[in-house]
Amino acid sequence: MNILINKRIFLLVTLVGIQLNVTAKQNSSNSNREELLPIIVNTNDDSNKLPGRSVLKQKNIEQXQADNAANLINILPGVNMAGGFRPGGQTLNINGMGDAEDVRVQLDGATKSFEKYQQGSIFIEPELLRRVTVDKGNYSPQYGNGGFAGTVKFETKDARDFLQENQKIGGFLKYGNNSNNNQKTYSTALVLQNEQKNIDLLLFGSVRNAGDYKRPDNSKILFSKNNQKTGLIKLNWQISPEHLLTLSSVYGIHKGWEPFAAKRDILPKPSLSDIMRYGTDIAWKRKLVYRDQKDENYTLKYNYLPENNPWINLSTQFSYSKTTQNDMRPKEASSGLVGSLGNQSWITYSDLTFDINNTSTFNIKTTVHELLFGLQWLKNTRNTLMYDKSKVRKADYNYGYFQPYYMPSGRQYTQAFYLQDQIKWKNIIFSTGVRYDHINNIGQKNLALKYNDISAGHDYSQKNYNGWSYYLGLNYDVNHYLSLFTNFSKTWRAPVIDEQYETQFKQSSVPATSLNLEKEMINQTRVGGIITLNHLFQENDAFQFRTTYFYNRGKNEIFKTRGVNCVGNAADTNNKVCPKIIENYRNLPGYVIQGAELEAYYQSTYLFGEITYSYVKGKRDTSPRNPWGKTSTWIAEIPPRKATTALGFNVPKYYLTVGWRAEFVRRQDRSPLSGDPKASSWSLPASRGYSLHNLFLSWSPAKIKGMNVKITVDNLFNRAYNPYLGELASGTGRNIKFSLSQKF
């Protein structure tokens, strides 16, 4: 995979692609011009009419020219990017839930999980993507053990995205430039297809080099440079009309000096004495780590669909993903950095997944059934190790090499089966489903005896969880343009490895691992309607209006034990009355998150537009630091209200699309502090409201087949803003993005 993203290979494929241009023209009788669709969710796609689903297609993705995957989908209602703008500093928040275990992320069907302390959780290169699907909430039995907020499915490009009819070999070149951080992006592809058109291969590489971002006041977000290389190999083999095999492989690397906490913004400057002692360069680097990150993803899919057998539609998938971050501080760095992964650290998260399912279609009297049955096996592994040079002579710290007490190593195994019957009768679709999960958590003993002391409650033994989840859905097509829907699910999740096996030293107030945790459970309900009107004002136009209300009731929330440690201190006076051994995590009583979304989309041959509005509010039954208290508190991770709007026009004759997009965000001042003044550790700073305006243009010159020019201007008015979920990290200033691409 490194070959793909080497610059010399980029130049080689460039030369090959130029030669292929002549061949491609000879092999194709159709124009290679792009048909520019409106930069909105396509209302004509039936998959977009599913409740709670938002879709970004390839044109949407390419026009945004986003630097990271989280920022790409930030435009969707109910979806927000959390964190800052440094590389690898972004997480996702869907309808007020933002923990990594709440938002399920998949790349080509492979689960991606990364929960490193103070880091982002998503490292997918947008240049690779052809489609992003966001399913909000957990209403499908195909997904279990978490993912309460929803599932984000990223799909990589395919050979068919580049090939014309009857084309056997093709190429692609792209150059991009961003003004804010002087970013240069280079992408190239080589595409092959056999004579029978049943085998195609895509080789795709992308290089992204950027300097520091600038804030609206023109100051730099120091150490936000990006040096990233990514490669993709994707093979489709239609073995026969009934058998399809797909293999995809993604590999990305990122290296550079950056703050340990990638999600944060402001970096304290080195003192004058440090500069005098070490020099400016080393004085700054003493506050940084040199990060070597590798992200890889492999998926093998097999589909069997007999032509005349409605009982069989078999799908099998085997996937493996791994993310590795190795951080090293300079030798001049101080010691005693246990709380920030020491002087050097080696962190790896991996996911191994196997899924097999079959869908049978049959009739019972006047009803049509689609019966889905599947089996799943998943393995999540977390390997962590750090080196703290201040502990090099201490045997109880294994002479400096041990696992961070707040990031234990361990494995989680999931065995599951699921069943769903979707019943269609006249204009009503009723679905019911069940899922059973059996979870095995297995901790790994810490190498440091300081965190491996059974008398302090450091117990890394296996813990098992199991249970059923239930799903109901109803969709009623009132007529050809109005659909009403409602969904309900009752699901649960087991603790992740960090929650189960985090420790502290014996003398601390909460030293123990958390083997007494119960399952966290949630009941989710949503209701709404979809109106779809075609040929409303003119031929071939479309209008869609969607409204959704959701209500989530969570119980036994898994949360850190801080503040009031036991029921004996419910009055919050003195924790000395509590037992000596307290677990690091506990179950809080519960919470309610509810909200609404309104969406309107219009598109026609010449005009398109959209308006969306999302509102979420959430409260815990008690304070996060006192589960025995009587005062409810706001949930800190609830995003402020957000509205987006877009308006643009197409000029089909000239293959031109021009548009404007705006985002309006309300202030957020609801804080746990209003219910518990001592809950500052679980609060985010209040934020002011703001509005951002963007412009975009896409043009495919008619005389140069396959060429496309895109221009996007982000933050047109250079407005200063601080996103609430970024903990008031500054937004970036005006950014003019330009790209030029050529298909051969």
Curated annotation (Swiss-Prot):
Instruction: Give the TBDR beta-barrel domain ranges.
Output: 168-744
Query: What SUPFAM superfamilies does UniProt report for this protein, alphabetically?
Result: Porins
| Cross-referenced PANTHER family | FE(3+) DICITRATE TRANSPORT PROTEIN FECA (PTHR30442:SF0), IRON III DICITRATE TRANSPORT PROTEIN FECA (PTHR30442)
Membrane-spanning segments = none
**What Pfam families does UniProt report for this protein, alphabetically?**
Plug, TonB_dep_Rec_b-barrel
Q: Which GO terms describe its biological process?
A: siderophore transmembrane transport
Q: Which GO terms describe its cellular component?
A: cell outer membrane
Where does the UniProt annotation place the signal sequence? Answer: 1-24
Respond yes or no to whether keyword DNA repair is given for this record.
no
Q: What is this protein called?
A: TonB-dependent heme receptor A
Record-annotated TBDR plug domain positions: 45-157
| Family per similarity comment | Belongs to the TonB-dependent receptor family.
Q: Which InterPro entries match?
A: Plug_dom (IPR012910), Plug_dom_sf (IPR037066), TonB-dep_rcpt-like (IPR039426), TonB-dep_rcpt_b-brl (IPR000531), TonB_haem/Hb_rcpt (IPR011276), TonB_Hb/transfer/lactofer_rcpt (IPR010949), TonB_rcpt_b-brl_sf (IPR036942), TonB_rcpt_CS (IPR010917)
Report keywords, A-Z.
Answer: Cell outer membrane, Membrane, Receptor, Signal, TonB box, Transmembrane, Transmembrane beta strand, Transport
Q: Which domain of life is it from?
A: Bacteria
- Function of the molecule: Heme receptor.
